[in-house]
Amino acid sequence: MKKITLLLALLAQSLFAAAQVFVEGVKLEPANTGQYIELDPLFREDGRCAFQVDYGQSNPKQDYVTDNHGKRFDFRSLVDGLNFFYEEGWEIAQISVLERGRHFMLKRRY
């Protein structure tokens, strides 16, 4: 019975665990990003999408969304990636259409 209770407690805890946004292993939080970030989506041939993120760091063109260990994270689609950022507290503030595609300026929701 204790094992079942422990298992249920661990499962319930995992439901409330939220993913966090990392760029090259650096966690994005208000102290290091401010209110805005810029996303540059990069598409693969299979339709998956990665994002380069500019949050004010010194070399933004080489910084991708990663897990906490620095491994690059690919999303199933552009919308999947934008939904991920929305769930993490960001919303689209502006969309810029450039020669090589769209750029998304995101603003912190809270």
Feature map (PLM): residue ranges:
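N-terminal signal peptide c-region/cleavage motif recognized by signal peptidases
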Residues: 12-16
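Terminus-proximal functional modules
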Residues: 4, 17-110
